[in-house]
């Protein structure tokens, strides 16, 4: 016997199921990333009030991605999405130097939550096409990622509008979640 329901479903249907929570400050590019992954194209977005949820299939893994609005009034609601989250995607607007401290604070607060203790962390350093964008190395420092203990994390430079870096991030996420 010894099969978990997840591995049984994988054997029957061939796809592993993963629950991913995608958060970040407002206007970081979360919804653009979600629909670029889902549809392969750029869609016109408006600020997300509440959430979007889509299934993204990639490399025999079925990711259920929850894209939760990032406005400051909505952020206290993020915690309602933490349960059973296996992977956390934190999207940062690499060009928004004025709010990087705010992004760091929100990320660090989230990572203290007990329900996310086992979730792996993928940071999308988005908007790398803009001339003033912070590099992944600079963001690693500003987000204090090197200070994280007992957490698997990875930062990926991305440009959601062009699709650059998104699948490289999913490759890392897939590999990490396959280890669990």
UniProtKB/Swiss-Prot annotation:
* Any one GO molecular function term: GTP binding
Q: Show the Gene3D superfamilies listed in the entry.
A: P-loop containing nucleotide triphosphate hydrolases
Gene Ontology cellular component list? cytoplasm; Golgi apparatus; plasma membrane; presynapse
Q: Does the keyword GTP-binding apply?
A: yes
Q: Subcellular location, in the record's words?
A: Golgi apparatus
Q: Which domain of life is it from?
A: Eukaryota
Sites where the protein binds GTP? 24-31, 67-71, 126-129
Name where it mostly resides: Golgi
| Record lipid sites (N-myristoyl glycine) | 2
Sorted keywords for this record are: ER-Golgi transport, Golgi apparatus, GTP-binding, Lipoprotein, Myristate, Nucleotide-binding, Protein transport, Transport
- Keyword field contains Transport: yes
Q: What job does the chain carry out?
A: GTP-binding protein involved in protein trafficking; may modulate vesicle budding and uncoating within the Golgi apparatus.
Against PANTHER family, the record matches this protein to: ADP RIBOSYLATION FACTOR-RELATED (PTHR11711)
Instruction: Show the NCBIfam families listed in the entry.
Output: small_GTP
Similarity comment text for this entry:
Belongs to the small GTPase superfamily. Arf family.
Give the protein's recorded name: ADP ribosylation factor 4
């Amino acid at each position: 016997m010894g099969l978990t329901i997840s591995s049984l479903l994988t054997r029957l249907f061939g796809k592993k199921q993963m629950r991913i929570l995608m958060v970040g400050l407002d206007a970081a590019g979360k919804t653009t990333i979600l629909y670029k992954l889902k549809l392969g194209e750029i869609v016109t977005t408006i600020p997300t009030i509440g959430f979007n949820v889509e299934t993204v299939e990639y490399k025999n893994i079925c990711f259920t991605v929850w894209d939760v609005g990032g406005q400051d009034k909505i952020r206290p609601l993020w915690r309602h999405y933490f349960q059973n989250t296996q992977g956390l995607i934190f999207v940062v607007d690499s060009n928004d130097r004025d709010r990087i401290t705010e992004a760091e604070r929100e990320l660090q607060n989230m990572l203290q939550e007990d329900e996310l203790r086992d979730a792996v962390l993928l940071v999308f350093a988005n908007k790398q096409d803009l001339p003033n964008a912070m590099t992944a190395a600079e963001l690693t420092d500003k987000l204090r990622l090197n200070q994280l203990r007992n957490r698997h994390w990875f930062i990926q430079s991305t440009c959601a509008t062009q699709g650059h870096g998104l699948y490289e991030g999913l490759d890392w996420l897939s590999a990490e979640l396959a280890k669990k």
